[in-house]
Amino acid sequence: MLEQTTPFFSFSTNNLEETRQFYESVLGFEVEVRRDRFLHVQLPENRPLIIYYKENHSPASYTVLNFQVQDIGMLVDRLIEKGVIFEQYGPPIQTDAKGISWDEEGSHIAWFKDPGGNILALIEN
């Protein structure tokens, strides 16, 4: 029934300008402000991401957006250079000093937050 539709992602923030700068300058996406309340972020493969202003915004407690990458170590280093702070987790996930969880049998993952406190992740399979 919905297989012919184009799904998109959306979540909220409490600071549109900081969030716009982060997705544009740090992550490198094209970002357009719409109606003074919405950010339209153009993700790869023409997938839109809508980030909307919400006065009583509460960050999601789960990962809202995952980026599948080829070289997680290199990207983590580049994002750290741009000021991104990666999350640190203990067992059973256990991240290293840079914030990367190295899974010998699966995906390597590193989590970080956008200015609204929403959790994003880099994943290398």
Task: Describe the residue ranges of each PLM region.
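Short amphipathic alpha-helices within nucleic acid-binding modules
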Residues: 22, 61, 73-78
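N-terminal beta-strand motif that seeds the catalytic metal site of vicinal oxygen chelate
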Residues: 1-17, 48, 62-65, 123-125
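A generic "structured core" feature
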Residues: 15, 24, 39-41, 76, ...
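Short Gly/charged-rich anion-binding patches and loops
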Residues: 18-19, 36, 74
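Helix N-cap motif at beta-to-alpha junctions
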Residues: 15-16, 69-73
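Amphipathic alpha-helical segments
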Residues: 17-30
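Conserved short beta-strand elements that form part of the metal-binding/catalytic scaffold
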Residues: 30-63, 69, 87-88, 105, ...
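Vicinal oxygen chelate
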Residues: 1-2, 67, 77-125
